[in-house]
């Protein structure tokens, strides 16, 4: 029986939480899209990777409820709605509506929001979300091309996109221990709150969250809460996650569609030591030019003889991204680049490329779909510093 069933709103977020579950003792499988077959054997956690972060609300809720239905059929004990540690959901976003839909389907009157991931500098204090030492709305996330985050106070963000009141369980309460946290959660629920944002400044706070929420039918958050919950579930039988999911040998390629500040720094470094080619957005905008352009890029990748995998990137700085969006339109440009990466990945796979390193949630989603990958056994984390 699955102990934790995760419904993740994008591919990289799904992989991220799966790695935390494995790291903390739960054998885990990640599946792309709503499963239709039987449950994989010998696992304690299953992560369903959807592509619902930025799609229409109706589509996001329908897919999430379909994932929930499948997990319920497998006898899953706890449902975990996973979103980004930077929240990535405005007043018109999907986190609130999906959470409400899951709550209604599970007939639960109360749940929590815990996006904190201290190991990556995402902390929550008095309900305010910080990225490193900056408030969310003062970080690079304020320039996000799809979900610009201009408010840092999570209860206000939650209430703007959902159907109830949202309180806060402060770091001061967490310092008093798990019993104090349980009492505060009970108090908020008794006073008519539908949600609670959980402060977290340290991994110890996440461990307390996991202990306090061990029996909750539904939790929501980033990857951090999974640390505490996995340690609680793993204590039952001492299961150690198997070291599966090792990379294949063979030719590789790096595809980068993320425009985050961290990815910009990573791309700037990598292109100094490996072959790199920047995507020309203008050539992605029509079907005729896009197909020829994907073929051209595939030929370029296959022609490289460097020991390091060649890089094809659409990663752009804040100013460059703004110029692209102004010239072509944000939605049109984003979809065109995604289609390019999808076609490019398929062409490269057909030519024998077996290793794909992909940066960006949307990019990862379209690449895995184009490769026809249905699921993964999640192995050990190879580079904690690369988590997003």
Curated annotation (Swiss-Prot):
It catalyses: 3-dehydro-L-erythronate + ATP = 3-dehydro-4-O-phospho-L-erythronate + ADP + H(+); 3-dehydro-D-erythronate + ATP = 3-dehydro-4-O-phospho-D-erythronate + ADP + H(+). It is an enzyme of class 2 (transferase). Disulfide bonds: none annotated. ATP binds at residues 258, 360-363. The keyword Cytoplasm does not apply. The keyword ATP-binding applies. This is 3-oxo-tetronate kinase. It comes from Escherichia coli (strain K12). The lineage of its organism: Bacteria, Pseudomonadati, Pseudomonadota, Gammaproteobacteria, Enterobacterales.
């Amino acid at each position: 029986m699955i102990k934790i069933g995760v419904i993740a709103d994008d591919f990289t977020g799904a992989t991220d939480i799966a790695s935390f579950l494995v790291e903390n003792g739960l054998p885990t499988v990640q599946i792309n899209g709503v499963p239709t077959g039987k449950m994989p054997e010998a696992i304690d956690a299953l992560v369903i990777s959807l592509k619902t972060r930025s799609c229409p609300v109706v589509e996001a809720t329908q897919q999430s409820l379909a994932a929930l239905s499948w997990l319920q059929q497998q006898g899953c004990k706890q449902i975990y709605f996973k979103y980004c540690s930077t929240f990535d959901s405005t007043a018109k976003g999907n986190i609130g509506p999906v959470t409400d839909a899951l709550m209604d389907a599970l007939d639960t009157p109360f749940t929590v929001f815990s996006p904190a991931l201290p190991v990556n500098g995402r902390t929550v204090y008095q309900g305010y979300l910080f990225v490193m030492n900056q408030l969310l709305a003062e970080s690079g996330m304020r320039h996000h091309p799809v979900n610009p985050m201009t408010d840092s106070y999570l209860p206000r963000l939650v209430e703007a996109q959902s159907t109830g009141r949202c309180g806060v369980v402060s770091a001061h309460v967490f310092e008093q221990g798990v019993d104090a946290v349980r009492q505060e959660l009970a108090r908020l629920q008794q006073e008519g709150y539908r949600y609670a944002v959980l402060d977290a400044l340290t991994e110890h706070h996440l461990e307390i969250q996991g202990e306090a929420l061990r029996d909750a039918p539904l939790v929501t958050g980033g990857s951090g809460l999974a640390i505490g919950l996995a340690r609680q579930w793993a204590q039952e039988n001492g299961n150690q996650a198997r070291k599966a999911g090792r990379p294949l040998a063979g030719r590789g390629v790096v595809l980068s569609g993320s425009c985050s500040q961290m990815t910009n720094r990573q791309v700037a470094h990598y292109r100094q030591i490996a072959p790199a080619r920047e995507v020309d957005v203008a050539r992605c905008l029509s079907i005729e030019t896009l197909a020829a352009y994907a073929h051209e890029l595939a030929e370029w990748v296959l022609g490289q003889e460097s020991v390091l995998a060649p890089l094809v990137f659409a990663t752009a700085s804040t100013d460059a991204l703004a110029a692209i969006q102004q010239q072509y339109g944000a939605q049109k440009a984003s979809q065109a680049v995604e289609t390019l990466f999808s076609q490019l990945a398929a062409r490269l796979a057909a030519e024998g490329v077996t290793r794909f390193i992909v940066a960006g949630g949307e990019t990862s989603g379209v690449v895995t779909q184009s490769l026809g990958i249905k699921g993964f056994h999640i192995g050990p984390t190879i580079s904690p510093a690369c988590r997003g």
